[in-house]
Amino acid sequence: MPLIESLGIESVMVEDPYENYESQNSIVDPAIFDKYVEKVRRLMESHIYHDGKSLKEFEIIANDIVHDINDMPYDVIVDIKERNSDLYEHTVMVTLLSVLVARKLKLDEKRKYNIAVGCLLHDIGLRFIVTRYKNRDFSNANPAELFEYKKHTILGYSALDEESWIAP
């Protein structure tokens, strides 16, 4: 048991006396973030509703994100806000953070691109399930809901099976 818990302390808050003097430093400009979210939303929805339209346009988004991250100052400190987001905002944020980490690890451009593509597609199967998953704790879900949620990985894989442009 960690020392803090043994003292009966359940949570800790750190006050930053300089917080009011700092400006938020997002990974990318909020307008660019919103543009990415809208592109991801449009692509995922058109794939669902238009008989399997190719997801190849994710290549362009992946390249744009890698380019935007590469253009950032190298030693920038990024603020990450806790917030509720939808599937599309989550997808873009995971992609941005992952490419940022890949850059810090000095991975080559091809690996950063593959990471971006994987992140953009990592939850595509959630578009095919019928159970509610947003803001949900599945530790107390009934077996049928848990089974339905877990299907998103298989459904996502199946949705990508015909996409020949994705690296093996």
Whereabouts are the PLM-identified features?
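Acidic/His-rich, divalent-metal-binding segments that scaffold phosphate/diphosphate chemistry
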Residues: 17-150, 154-164, 168
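N-terminal accessory interaction module
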Residues: 1-15
